[in-house]
Swiss-Prot record:
Name of this chain's protein: 2-succinyl-5-enolpyruvyl-6-hydroxy-3-cyclohexene-1-carboxylate synthase
Gene for this chain: menD
Cofactor note: Binds 1 thiamine pyrophosphate per subunit.
Role played: Catalyzes the thiamine diphosphate-dependent decarboxylation of 2-oxoglutarate and the subsequent addition of the resulting succinic semialdehyde-thiamine pyrophosphate anion to isochorismate to yield 2-succinyl-5-enolpyruvyl-6-hydroxy-3-cyclohexene-1-carboxylate (SEPHCHC).
One Pfam short name: TPP_enzyme_M_2
Cofactor(s) of this protein: Mg(2+); Mn(2+); thiamine diphosphate
């Protein structure tokens, strides 16, 4: 290249073309000066959809929502300096959730690093603890051989592509230093291509002979966590043929099927004193939400088998006896060919206690006025065509306990399990799905900036906001009794915020509810941008939850 602008243009147009070739269709851009070359290249590409979000932290979570909704990798782009650091929470969540987030950070040229230049921090390897792949690109120089630069880009993107699909999925980081002038030549649009490449396929085949002896034992359990869009029909088929109960996390999507072998009330039963024994456990997918079930897995003597379709198995809460890196469908298809034993009585015990528990839960909800009553009512309003995104902390735990008859899809950020970026993730999903957000007041406050994407892009999202003026989940922890004098200031953390003002700021309709009877008339099927605020009381919420545990303990007369 005989001038800087042409070299820069060739570089960024090639990068964007390669990103498209490997399946990137959406990019979330946080505006800034140093990212000018890539931002213009992305905007000029005829088949890429760009989203503009001025807050990098929220932007990265919005991209995560786009990934969850589209089931495709998504890229994010920011300028240099502290802007990139704001991506860290979402990158850590993507890493633990095995989501292919493509992180594009613009950077100052090498001669401005480490000398106190503005907006210049050390961006190389800055996400090393979380990304699957990282590369610091060379600067486009006017005397560069264009083939060398193009080949470098293509080689690095080819290497990075293995982490966008299959069991190796996870975030990748491409750091791109640019020297001024920063504007590429937009008349060279013919350098932008829309070719696609054969995407890598990664699937190991594994023999299951080493666990054949386990299949001859009677008390077997299948525990299924978040399956991240994986096919699960063979789990149900295997369970039907072999009479094995399935303890299904709501994020597994198996509860939607209303299969007679699927157990939904296990967390409440364990909290209420159920004693559980098993010979072996097949753990599928990511770890479950239920703290009580995870505690049992940690101490049980049952033989544990882990099945996850990624090369970084999530072994929590305890390392299994054997682990398989393969899809659930392939695993259970092979397992079905093994000889087995009669388990009808074992399954019927589970079905009986599940049936009795559901009766008690529904009876309790008829008179309850706490957050569980509202959550149960929200789930009752949703149909099989709906989806719900659930915030961490108390909302996801209530959904875990009360998702019984609902047929909606359930989603949550259960990688790092934080309360940051929840609204932004839900808004990203809302681009591709009709979705309702269930969230607490602290998580909502934490990501109010994210609501701007709804206002700017007319993204419709119904938000059910559970407002107990603080951190309700802490009321259940030992700190409530052990450090009561300090509890409200350090853990209760009331804010006293009036969220009606938030609705006005971001053009959301707003309704506030003080009683469950009034909320029953709320029509969540009328989709728009709407905040349904529910006022609750933390201590009352705790006492009514404890009342439900007591009811269930009275029906437990069997050891499973």
């Amino acid at each position: 290249m005989n001038n800087h602008t042409d070299a820069l243009t060739k570089q960024v147009f090639t990068i964007v073309s390669e990103l498209y070739a490997y399946g990137i269709r959406e990019v979330v851009i946080s505006p800034g000066s140093r990212s000018t070359p890539l931002a213009i290249a992305i905007e000029a590409h005829p088949k890429l959809k760009s989203w503009i979000h001025p807050d990098e932290r929220s932007a990265a979570f919005f991209a995560m929502g786009l990934m969850k909704g589209s089931e495709k990798p998504v890229a994010i782009l920011c300028t240099s300096g502290s802007a990139a650091a704001n991506y860290t929470p979402a990158i850590s969540e993507s890493s633990l959730s095995h989501l292919p987030l493509v992180v594009l950070t613009s950077d100052r040229p090498h001669e401005l690093r480490g000398i106190g230049a503005p907006q210049a921090i050390n961006q190389t390897n800055m996400f090393a603890n979380y990304v699957q792949y990282q590369f610091d690109f060379p600067i486009a120089e006017k005397n560069d051989n264009e083939d060398i630069m193009a080949n470098t880009i293509k080689f690095q993107l080819q290497k990075a592509s293995q982490f966008l699909y299959g069991p190796h999925r996870g975030p990748i980081h491409l750091n791109l230093p640019f020297r001024e002038p920063l504007t590429p030549n937009t008349e060279k649009v013919e350098w932008l291509t829309s070719d696609t490449k054969i995407l890598p396929h990664y699937q190991k085949t594994t023999s299951l002979n080493e666990i054949s002896a386990m299949m001859k034992k009677r008390k077997g359990l299948i525990i299924v966590g978040d399956m991240q869009h994986q096919d699960v029909d063979q789990i149900l088929t295997f369970s039907t043929i072999h009479d094995m109960p399935i303890l299904a996390d709501p994020l597994s999507q198996l509860r939607r099927e209303h299969h007679p072998n699927v157990v939904t009330t296990y967390d409440l039963l364990l909290r209420s004193g159920l004693e559980l024994e098993a010979d072996f456990v097949i753990r599928v997918g990511k770890p479950v939400i239920s703290k009580k079930l995870n505690q049992w897995l940690k101490v049980t003597e049952a033989f544990q088998i882990l099945v996850q379709n990624n090369d970084r198995p999530d072994a929590f809460p305890i390392t299994p006896h054997v682990s398989y890196e393969m899809s659930a469908n392939d695993f259970f298809r092979q397992l079905s060919e093994m000889p087995t034993v009669e388990r009808k009585q074992w399954l019927e015990k589970w079905q009986t206690v599940e049936k009795h528990a559901i009766v008690e839960i529904k009876d309790h909800l008829r008179t309850a006025t706490d957050e569980a009553a509202y959550v149960g009512n929200v789930l009752d309003k949703l149909t099989k065509d709906d989806a719900i995104f659930v915030s961490n902390s108390m909302p996801i735990r209530d959904v875990d306990n009360l998702f019984i008859d609902c047929e909606a899809e359930v989603f949550a950020n259960r990688g790092a399990n934080g309360i940051d970026g929840v609204t932004s993730t839900a808004l990203g999903m809302a681009v591709h799905k009709k979705i309702t957000l269930l969230i607490g007041d602290l998580a909502f406050y934490h990501d109010m900036n994210g609501l701007l994407m709804s206002k700017l892009n007319d993204i419709q999202l119904n938000i059910v906001l559970l407002n107990n003026d603080g951190g309700g989940i802490f009321s259940y922890l030992p700190q409530k009794n052990e450090a009561d004098a300090y509890f409200e200031r350090l853990f209760g953390t009331p804010t006293g915020l009036n969220f009606e003002h938030t609705a006005l700021l971001y053009d959301f309709a707003f309704d506030r509810f003080d009683t469950i009877e009034a909320f029953k008339y709320a029509d969540l099927s009328q989709f728009g941008s709407h905040i349904y605020e529910i006022m609750t009381h933390r201590e009352d919420n705790k006492q009514q939850h404890l009342k439900l545990y007591k009811k269930l303990s009275d029906i437990i007369d069997v050891t499973l």
